[in-house]
Amino acid sequence: MAAPRESLRRRKAGAGDPEPEAPPGQGRDLKGRPARLRAGTFWLTRIVLLRALAFVYFVAFLVAFHQNKQLIGDRGLLPCRAYLQSVQRHFGGRVSWDALSYAPTILWLLDWSHMDANLDALALLGLGISSFILVSGCANMVLMAALWVLYMSLVNVGQIWYSFGWESQLLETGFLGIFLCPLWTLSALPRGTPTSWVVMWGFRWLIFRIMLGAGLIKIRGDRCWRDLTCMDFHYETQPVPNPVAYFLHRSPWWFHRFETLSNHFLELVVPFFIFLGRRMCIVHGALQVLFQVVLIISGNLSFLNWLTIVPSLACFDDATLGGLFPSGPGRLKDQVLKIQEEETRGARAPRTRGSVARGTVNLALGILVAWLSIPVVLNLLSPRQVMNSSFNPLRIVNTYGAFGSITRERTEVILQGTASANASAPDSAWEDYEFKCKPGDPRRRPCLISPYHHRLDWLMWFAAFQTYEHNEWIIHLAGKLLANDAQALSLLARNPFEGRDPPRWVRGEHYRYKFSRPGGRHAAEGKWWIRRRLGPYFPPLSRQDLRGYFTSRQWPYPEPE
C-alpha cells in the first residue's frame, strides 16, 4: 500500500507535471494569436498622416508645374514679376521687411529675369520632396518645412489664381505637419520622437474649424440651406461638374432634402464628437472621411476634399489604423507592438536635451495656435462670419467655409474666334475654343479630374458672374488667342485655329447651361448640356484694339507665332 501513497504524494508535489509552456512569441498574446495594438499611441497614425499630406503636396506642386508659367510666368496672364514689382513700389521701391511680410516668398531672393525657371524649380523641388515622403512614409522637420516654404512662396505670388480656400488650408495643414517629425532623423518610427499630443490636437482643432465653419456659413448664408433646397441646384451649378453630378442632379426631391440635412448634421453636430472621448472621436473621423469621399465622387473640387481628409486622420490612433499595415516580424506594425510592450513594462526613452527642447517646441506650438485662434473663433461666433480668410501673412491659422451661397442657374463664358475680316458681318463664322474641363460643347462629357485642378477653368466660372472689366486677365487671354500663343493655348483643350493663321477677331459670349435629362431627347442626341445664348460678354476684339490696353498694363504685346 505504500507505493500508491508515494505516487500520490509525487503527483501532488507536481513531480509528474509536464514542462511549462514557452512564453508567447514577440507580437503574440498568451494564446499565440497576433497581439493587438493598444489605443492611445500614434506611431502608425503619423505615417498615414505624412503620406496623405505628401500626396496632396504632390498634386499641388504638379498643378503648379503644369500651369504656373502660363498663369504667373514671364508671359503669363498675370505675371508674378509685375506683382512683386508693384509690392516693392508700394513699400518704397526696395525689398524691405514690410514687403517680405506682405508677400512672404523666397522669390524675393532670386533673379527675376528668369521667373519661369524659378517657378519650375520651386515646383520640381516640391515634387521631389513630396514624392520621397509619399513613398517612404518618413520625413523630418527640415523636409516638411521646405515643402511649406516652397508652397507658400507660390501661393503668395499666385494672385487670383491662388485665391482659393484650399491654398491656406494646405499651408495650415503643412505647418502642423512640420511638428509631426523629428528634426533630422529620417525614420518611419523615430523611437526618440513619439508623436506629440499637441500636434494631434492641432490637427483635430483644424478639422473642427473646417467643418463647423462650413456649416455655419451655410446656415447664415443662402436661404436655400435653411429651407433644404440647395442640393436641387448644387450639382448643376458647382464650378466644374463631373459625370456623377449629371445623374445626381436628377435625384428625387426627398433625396436632395436628405442630402442637405445630412450636410448640416456632418458640419454642425458631428465636429463636437471630437471632444467626447476616444470612441466618439473615431466616429467623427470615420464620418468625415466618408463625407469627403462622397464629395470627391460627386464633384471636381480640386484637392480640397483630399486635403480635408488629412486632419481627420488625427482622430484615429494606432489601434484603429493597425489594420492598414501588414503583420509579420520586422514589419512596422510589429515594431510598434514592441514599443508598446516596452512602455507597458515601464521602459521609457531616456530624457535628453533634445527631448526637453522638443517638449518646449510643442508647448510653444500649442500657445501659438491658441493665440492665433482667437480672431478665428471670434469670426466663427460672429453673425458676419467671413470664410476662407487669414489673419496673418504666414496663414498658420485661418477661417474656412464653402458654398455659403448657391447659384440657381449656370452661366458660362464661351470664347470664340473668327477669320472673317468683318466681325459684324452676318456671314462671319465664329468657332468655339474648348477648355480642359469647364462646360463648352454640349456634347462633351463632363470631366473627372479630382484631385487635379485646372485653375483657369475654375476662374472662368467666377468670371461668368461678373463683367470682363472685373477680370482683366480674360482680355489678356483673348489677346494671346489672337496671336495663337502656344503657352496660353496649352491651358485649353481645343484651338479651332490650330495649324491655321490666328483669328482676326476674338469675342466672349454669355450662355446659360442646363443639364439635359437622362433618357430625354437631348441626351439621345448625345448632349450632356442644353445651352441658350444670353448675349455678348465682351465685344469682338482685334490685336490692334488691344495695343493700348496691353501697353498700359506693361503686358507684352502678342505677336503671331
UniProtKB/Swiss-Prot annotation:
Cytoplasmic side: 1-42, 145-200, 315-360
Topology in membrane: Multi-pass membrane protein
Residue ranges that the UniProt entry lists as topological domain Lumenal: 66-120, 215-285, 383-561
Subcellular location per the Swiss-Prot or TrEMBL entry: Endoplasmic reticulum membrane
Positions of region (Disordered): 1-32
Keyword Transmembrane among UniProt keywords: yes
One of the GO BP terms on file: triglyceride metabolic process
Similarity comment: family membership: Belongs to the lipase maturation factor family.
The protein, known as: Lipase maturation factor 1
Source species: Bos taurus
